[in-house]
Every structure is written in C-alpha cells, then in structure tokens.
Amino acid sequence: MLSNTNLNSFRSLIYRSGWLYNAVTRRLYDQDTKFFTIASIIGTGPKRILDLPCGTGYLMRFLHPDIEYEGVDLNHRFLKRIKAKELRKRNIKLKRIIIQRKNIFDFQNYMGEKKDVIVLCDILHHVYPKHIDLINIAKKIANKIISCEPYVVKPTEISARDKLFKIIIFLGKYLPKSLFKIVDFLFLDNDGINTYHQRSRWNLDQKTLKQFYKTMGFTNIQKIMDEYIAICEY
C-alpha cells in the first residue's frame, strides 16, 4: 500500500488467492461478526462508503442495499475475485459499486465531496510507520472513520478459532526468526507491498492499541476476539 511500490512484487500464498485468504482469515478471526459489526455501525443508506483497502470485498456481504460502495486495493487477484465471485455468485446488490486498483495513499483521488464513512480494516499494521498519515488524511475526507485492527498480529500469538490452526500456531512458536521470515514470505502475511521489516515493527498490544485509538480521537472502542473496532466521527 505504500508509494513507489512495485505492483508485481512476490506475494505469499494467501495473498495470491482471494478464496484462500478468506478461508484462512475466517479460521483465525471471527470475520462474519467483525464485518457484520462494521456494517451495523455504518447503518442504512443512502451513504457513501470508501473501503481502504477493500481486500476480497467481504464487507459488501453485510451492507445495506442503499449504500454507495467504493473499494480500493492493489491486489489484482483480490479485485478479480470480487468481480467474479462476490458480485456475481453472491448477487450483491448495492446502490452503487466502484472497485479500483490503486494505491490507497493516492490521496488526491479522494478529494472533492466528503465520504460519509471510510473503513480502515486490518491495514494500519501493514503500512507502519505511515498509519498515522492514513488516519489523518481520512479525517479530512470523511465524516466518520471505522477502524478495525488486531492487537495480536504475530502469527505465533493469534488465538485461532480452528483446531488445525491452533496446532500450526503452537508449532510456529519454536521456529527460529530466520526461518519464520521465510515462512512469512512464502505463506503468511507477505502482501507483496509492505516489507517484513516494516510490518514487524508494529508492536501495539491490547493496552497500547486502545490508547493509540484514543490519542487519534477514536471512541466507542469494542473488542472482538483479538481485534478492536473503533470509531472516529465529527
């Protein structure tokens, strides 16, 4: 998601398949409850929503039909799945749907009429140390920001919902750092955009993530498993 990025950089296995990404994240996190909660906070339409980044478009499954939705991501495979599976197979009907492949930091493309809501879901820890920049620009172009962020991002610390993944995570705790970096590069959180060095510097835990949200003006902070959903509005 960062500027001056090679869009064709190598991505890990789960970032090369929208289906696999959904399958894995649903076993690690309570995805349905998370996105249902975000959609409930957004409420009914008519409203203009900007999803940064949109990932596989999971949020659209739960949005009210009167919502105008704009999703932005750099992962062309995820966007392809949205158009081929989410919109057609699931027959998602929203008032308006715009899906674009572009850098979420291309702020000039978001200027003009304010959005009602910007959703920043599972992105801040990926763009560190530019996470504050992303929030600050979002404040200028939206009336409300909904952020969802895990306070546990290291795979060895995640409380997986699936028994198989619990075993995998347990075994992962004993991998040396050099080997874990290879596993991350090939199979885990390597999005092909943000380096392991950048992502691994994110160190906010349950207490400090909540404090960070408060410092940035977020309120109504609620916990869902290993994640916080927070709201900032004016």
Regions found by a protein language model. Give the residues of each.
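A short, conserved alpha-helix within the catalytic core of class I
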Residues: 127-138
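Class I SAM-dependent methyltransferase Rossmann-like catalytic core
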Residues: 13-32
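Conserved alpha-helix/loop element of class I SAM-dependent methyltransferases that forms part
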Residues: 28-45
